[in-house]
From Swiss-Prot:
Identified only in the intact 55S subunit. It is unknown whether it belongs to the 28S or to the 39S subunit. May localize at the subunit interface and dissociate from the 55S mitoribosome during subunit separation. Its main location: mitochondrion. Belongs to the mitochondrion-specific ribosomal protein mL63 family. The gene is MRPL57. GO terms for molecular function: structural constituent of ribosome. This is Large ribosomal subunit protein mL63. It comes from Bos taurus (Bovine). GO terms for biological process: mitochondrial translation. PANTHER family: LARGE RIBOSOMAL SUBUNIT PROTEIN ML63, MITOCHONDRIAL RIBOSOMAL PROTEIN 63.
Length: 102
């Protein structure tokens, strides 16, 4: 029994690279270097994104005209899907050909 416990000790159960009790991968120097480079890029992005390009006064309403134009274009595109309005007078105008009293 002690021999079995001694021989089976320290073994990763099941597949050693997947699962809950998997074998941890060794971290190489290249992986550390890539992680440091990614963190530096993220820090620089955070630095630049923390400073606004426009002031609050400039930002207020700067896209109102563009949004209104886009809404009008959307409204026109939706209206283009429907047929044009037809009036009842135009629809029944052919009946006026034989009208004697006018």
């Amino acid at each position: 029994m002690f021999l079995t416990a001694l021989l089976c000790r320290g073994r990763i159960p099941g597949r050693q690279w997947i699962g809950k009790h998997r074998r941890p991968r060794t971290v190489s120097a290249l992986a550390k270097q890539n992680m440091i480079r990614r963190l530096e890029i993220e820090a620089e992005n955070h630095y630049w994104l923390s400073r606004p390009f426009l002031t609050a006064e400039q930002e207020r309403g700067h896209a109102a005209a563009r949004r209104a134009a886009a809404f009008e274009a959307l409204k026109a595109a939706q209206a283009a899907k429907f047929p044009a309005h037809r009036r009842l007078e135009d629809q029944l105008d052919h009946l006026n050909v034989t009208r004697k009293w006018s």
